[in-house]
Curated annotation (Swiss-Prot):
GO cellular component, one term: ribonucleoprotein complex
Physiological role: Binds the 23S rRNA.
Region Disordered, annotated ranges: 65-86
Protein name: Large ribosomal subunit protein bL31
Keyword line: Ribonucleoprotein, Ribosomal protein, RNA-binding, rRNA-binding
Family, per entry: Belongs to the bacterial ribosomal protein bL31 family. Type A subfamily.
Biased composition (Basic and acidic residues): 73-86
Highest rank taxon of the organism: Bacteria
Assembly, per entry: Part of the 50S ribosomal subunit.
Pfam families: Ribosomal_L31 (PF01197)
Gene coding for it: rpmE
GO biological-process terms attached to the record: translation
Disulfide bridge map: none
GO molecular function per UniProt: rRNA binding; structural constituent of ribosome
Length: 86
């Protein structure tokens, strides 16, 4: 027999909700569970492909990489000019 007042309340008919729609019921310690993805809308389980826009990330990386390389070359040029003047 479990001790009283130490165990969470068990909800045998807890609702799993995705995008405002009840997708299934299960047992849980919360009456409602909000989820973003479930097997009914996940591309792996539905067989659909979702194209991700990664171009923005690549562009951001390339800009950062170019800036870092151009900044470092400018700094090297400045430091070599300062050494020549001394």
């Amino acid at each position: 027999m479990p001790k009283s007042d130490i165990h969470p309340t068990w909800y045998p008919e807890a609702k799993v909700i995705c995008n405002g729609e009840v997708v299934m019921t299960t047992g849980a310690t919360q009456p409602e569970i909000q989820v973003d993805v479930w097997s009914g809308n996940h591309p792996f389980f539905t067989g659909t492909q979702k194209i991700l826009d990664t171009e923005g990330r690549v562009d951001r990386f390339m800009r950062k990489y170019r800036m870092a390389s151009s900044d470092s070359s400018e700094q090297k040029d400045k430091s070599s000019e300062e050494k020549k003047e001394s």
